[in-house]
Amino acid sequence: MVKYSAIALLLLSIQVIHAQNTVCFDIAANPNADSTAFSDFTKYIRVLDCFSIYAESSIPDEKVLHAAAVAAELLDNDEDGEVDDPVLKAELAANGALIPIFAYDGSSAMDNFFDHYDGEGAAAVLWRNEIDPNNPGYWGADATVEEVVHVINAIGHTNIYPGAFAVEPNSSLLTTAMDVARGGQFIQHPNNYPPEAWYHYDDYTCDYECMAIEYLYWCIVTNMGI
């Protein structure tokens, strides 16, 4: 049976998107600078001993701190200094969950990272121009909440609670709900969604599993009120 108390991430308070950058984080030097994949990052924050932030030197400190604050709020919504779900913490740590922050799409650091990274912990990235600490989580202004949620879901929840969150067709409560929202099960993108569909995600680079991760994100931020 799925431990539904563990999926409380879906019911997070709207306060989570108002994470402040004055939390108790310090930006450290990159501890993995000798690794080819990580060699272009100079800024690093370890969040709650299970989630890492890596950033290029050109990323302003306030944006790096903002990403760390959002991750901390999502993982520790009651702000007691511990990840709310210890099983999730263990899974994220075991898989090396991380989010890299690049100067821009296609930067040399980004190319180097994806040419050499062979881990399981990178499910999303951030770019400098899509982080806005003054508008946390708001669509079109700040992508931090979206991308951090993607990492937590893809690296954590899909693995530890597959009955709820697995992303393959016919595999979970999530995919069943998404198929209803899309007006049917579409492994490939339809040319047009049925009239009864209310989830019309149309990014043709996003396959079925990607669609499920995006749908879970929209469920979460809808509950947040974003």
What are these regions (language model features)?
Residues 1-20:
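Bacterial Sec-dependent N-terminal signal peptides
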Residues 6-9, 137, 205:
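Residue-level detector of alpha-helix boundary/anchor positions
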Residues 20-49:
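N-terminal low-complexity, Pro/Thr/Ser-rich intrinsically disordered segments
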Residues 18, 70, 215-216:
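Generic detector of isolated residues embedded in canonical secondary-structure elements
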Residues 38-40, 48-189:
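Acidic/His-rich structured neighborhood in mature extracellular/periplasmic domains
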Residues 170-226:
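Metalloprotease/metallohydrolase-associated module, dominated by Zn2+-dependent proteases
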